[in-house]
A protein has these predicted regions:
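Short low-complexity stretches enriched in small and charged residues
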Residues: 1-3, 10-11, 44-51, 55, ...
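PAS-family sensory modules
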Residues: 1-42, 133-157
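N-terminal start-of-chain detector that recognizes signal peptides
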Residues: 13-19, 26-27, 51-54, 61-62, ...
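PAS-family sensory domain signal
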Residues: 20-78
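Conserved beta-strand and immediately adjacent loop positions that scaffold enzyme active sites
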Residues: 42, 52, 117-118, 133
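Acidic/polar residues at beta-strand termini and the immediately following turn/coil
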Residues: 46-47, 121-123, 157
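Short acidic, gly/pro-rich beta-turn/loop elements at beta-sheet edges
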Residues: 53, 128, 140-144
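PAS-family sensory domains
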Residues: 67-130
Length: 157
């Protein structure tokens, strides 16, 4: 029920987001903050077209000791900082396959979400090396004007 309401609100405001001072984005970001406060998992929204994050819950599971500001600044390149190098090709392929799959409009009703399991790189104070942490990620596609525009992502361990 919450996801349907979220998707409705997201679709309504996401198509009108143009810059960070935009009133619609402000409402959308406030809704993301509210939604992320009631879930225990990491949560973020990725703009597929601009390869930037729209929102990132300030949660260390996804951020891996990086700041929200750093992730927002790096955008799509942030994944190279946190995903294990052996899993990065998998993630890159997933981001290519989702739009290709959704290009087939007849498949839209078959898809609730996409998912994958991959390793994130963690830096711990007791180790001089990065350690891997396996996480499960769900990605809900949001289409605007019949084109994939956003992925609503939940990361859990």
């Amino acid at each position: 029920m919450i996801m349907n309401t979220f998707e409705d609100l997201f679709s309504e405001y996401a198509g009108r987001i143009t810059d960070t001072v935009n009133e619609q984005e402000s409402v959308f970001i406030q809704y993301c903050k509210l939604f992320s406060s009631i879930i225990t998992d990491s949560f973020y929204v990725l703009d597929i077209v601009q390869k930037q994050f729209c929102y990132i819950k300030p949660d260390n599971l996804f951020l891996c000791d990086h700041s929200v500001e750093e992730a927002m600044r790096l955008g799509h390149d942030f994944y190279t900082q946190i995903i294990h190098p052996d899993d990065l090709p998998l993630w890159t392929n997933i981001l290519k396959i989702i739009p290709q799959y959704l290009d087939r409009k007849d498949k839209w009703n078959e898809i609730d979400y996409f998912s994958c399991t991959l390793r994130l790189l963690r830096k711990y104070s007791f180790s001089s090396h990065f350690l891997s942490q396996m996480v499960y990620q769900r990605m809900k596609p949001i289409c605007l004007n019949n084109n994939l525009r956003y992925l609503i992502c939940i990361v859990e361990n």
